[in-house]
């Protein structure tokens, strides 16, 4: 599998996580919606499914790792930055085959693509703290 297939899977997964956070819909319904309504050519669909379901089912564990490093109330973090942080923290914690530098870099790129102007700096800072680099 090409790395770009995983990159595309992450990109779609962060959008699905964002949608799930805002809608409160069942994660299986969100997955079905994204796989039927989005262009999925060249995407590692199995990885997309794992990222989405893993992030949803392990949300409490993931948030426990994120929250101590945020200096404002968690509910004030933008939904897209929260989606990126959750996805990256899932990879950092549960996908030991993904080097932490790859997970962080991919998260920064997602935050640049979807987040606020300096959102990528916020995401980078939090993820660096999670992996113990700061």
Curated annotation (Swiss-Prot):
Pfam families: NusB. GO terms for cellular component: cytosol. One of its GO terms (molecular function) is RNA binding. One of its GO terms (biological process) is transcription antitermination. Keywords: RNA-binding, Transcription, Transcription antitermination, Transcription regulation. The keyword RNA-binding applies. The keyword Lipid metabolism does not apply. InterPro entries: NusB-like_sf, NusB_fam, NusB_RsmB_TIM44. Belongs to the NusB family. PANTHER family: ANTITERMINATION NUSB DOMAIN-CONTAINING PROTEIN, N UTILIZATION SUBSTANCE PROTEIN B-RELATED. NCBIfam families: nusB. Involved in transcription antitermination. Required for transcription of ribosomal RNA (rRNA) genes. Binds specifically to the boxA antiterminator sequence of the ribosomal RNA (rrn) operons. This is Transcription antitermination protein NusB. It comes from Shewanella sediminis (strain HAW-EB3).
